[in-house]
Swiss-Prot record:
Chain ranges on the Extracellular side, renumbered to this chain: 21-40
Keyword Transmembrane: yes
Organism: African swine fever virus (isolate Pig/Kenya/KEN-50/1950)
Record flagged with keyword Oxidoreductase: no
TM ranges: 41-61
UniProt name for this protein: Transmembrane protein B66L
Residues in the Cytoplasmic compartment per record: 62-66
């Protein structure tokens, strides 16, 4: 993994685990957030979002768009 992919992965990790992401995205799913903290289901959703976003970013890097 080159430095660009590692940096993108780190930034996506920070975004997906941020309070704003939990409050505005994850909280829209039923039983994913309790007391502004993700439940086990919410944590799984965060992982799924991280994988999807990193796959998109990896594709964009491979196509020299990023």
């Amino acid at each position: 993994m080159d430095i660009k992919r590692a940096l993108i992965l780190f930034l996506l990790f920070l975004v997906v685990l941020s309070n704003a992401f939990v409050d505005y995205i994850i909280s829209n799913f039923n039983h994913a957030v309790t007391c502004r903290k993700p439940t086990y289901f919410g944590i799984v959703l965060q992982g799924i979002f991280l994988v999807i976003l990193f796959s998109i970013a990896d594709y964009l890097i491979n196509e020299n768009i990023l």
